[in-house]
């Protein structure tokens, strides 16, 4: 494909030169965003002692944003503001907006984060909540949306789901005294393939339509990097009377999303990958507005709302401190909150999101498409397909993938290649038995880094 999303993805012969990569960087309108991050140095990633960043002037090549994003420079500033608030006014931080702080008072802080995240996932602010972590949020959403009956009890899911998703779904099926072997349906690719076609998913939906209560898929498959057609799959599953949920761990802050317009029922994501909010950072969830309504037609003391597991922080602020044990949920996703969220975690999240507030997912996606296409172009050069010591198991179609390319090495190569990359100061992710996952991130990676990575990677393969 020579063009995608209005971006030219065709490269001339001279594109294989270091000078061409540098020319792409010089014309990159997003290049300045790299200065908003602390890129680990080669000396730091090799060191076994705790040290301040910048042990050496030469930065590593960090292509591991699909596992953990690097630290925004704003994080320290936001954390310091939060610690100063706590130390200077104590409990007053819950209700006081301090002049000069980038953060709202604590009781409004989750809304600050949700507002920024809503732009990233294509939702209304009230459809998003900043809370919990990914699997915890999936459990809460499954508790509300998975309502099995004697006839409709199956959940359709990815054949190679991230283990935590698998455990969560399996446990909810068992919680309802059902047999996961009967109620879990795994959708996999054709024999010898890695990509699951949309038509294959449709065929599973049709086959199990009378028995399936839900389909829950990853927006992007973590192992292969495949981006599923969320809009088409959601619409098709709805036509077969299924609830549709999405795990957006690898899609959040990576690709453009329009969860509201696509009529997705629910979704959850982590924020520490492409979102750069820090290890184990607070997650997010989406509940479509149709499921977040609160109906007071029967009276102020008799609200009707979607059944869910409840906690005091999901209660409307107007009644939150009345302590009368009459739960009145916040309309929207906020009503799914359980406990008072960590203001420290929210500071890290808001710091990371402040970077996204300065750009758009459309602009980031345009650069990402070209960055990953350039990576693919350089990787495939100089090899005949039958002699290439690796294959790319990520879809060739740029619209069917995010930033990541998954490189499946021939048997016996992984350990040596991984060691050579590490010695060269390259950080990327390996998955047994033979996959290297490479994810150039548009916020802080460059075309020159892609060029250097490919050269070192190919040298490692030859050794």
UniProtKB/Swiss-Prot annotation:
Residues forming coiled coils: none
Protein's pathway: Amino-acid degradation; L-kynurenine degradation; L-alanine and anthranilate from L-kynurenine: step 1/1; Cofactor biosynthesis; NAD(+) biosynthesis; quinolinate from L-kynurenine: step 2/3
Subcellular location: Cytoplasm
Binding site for pyridoxal 5'-phosphate: 134-135, 162-165, 247, 250, 272, 312, 340
GO cellular component, one term: cytoplasm
Enzymatic reactions: L-kynurenine + H2O = anthranilate + L-alanine + H(+); 3-hydroxy-L-kynurenine + H2O = 3-hydroxyanthranilate + L-alanine + H(+)
Listed SUPFAM superfamilies: PLP-dependent transferases (SSF53383)
Protein name: Kynureninase 2
Function, as annotated: Catalyzes the cleavage of L-kynurenine (L-Kyn) and L-3-hydroxykynurenine (L-3OHKyn) into anthranilic acid (AA) and 3-hydroxyanthranilic acid (3-OHAA), respectively.
Record's keyword annotation contains Hydrolase: yes
GO process terms (BP): 'de novo' NAD biosynthetic process from L-tryptophan; anthranilate metabolic process; L-kynurenine catabolic process; L-tryptophan catabolic process to kynurenine; quinolinate biosynthetic process
Modification N6-(pyridoxal phosphate)lysine, positions: 273
Organism superkingdom: Eukaryota
Disulfide-bond pairs as recorded: none
Assembly, per entry: Homodimer.
E.C. no: 3.7.1.3
Molecular function GO labels: kynureninase activity; pyridoxal phosphate binding
Gene3D superfamilies: Aspartate Aminotransferase, domain 1, Type I PLP-dependent aspartate aminotransferase-like (Major domain)
Keywords, comma-separated and alphabetical: Cytoplasm, Hydrolase, Pyridine nucleotide biosynthesis, Pyridoxal phosphate
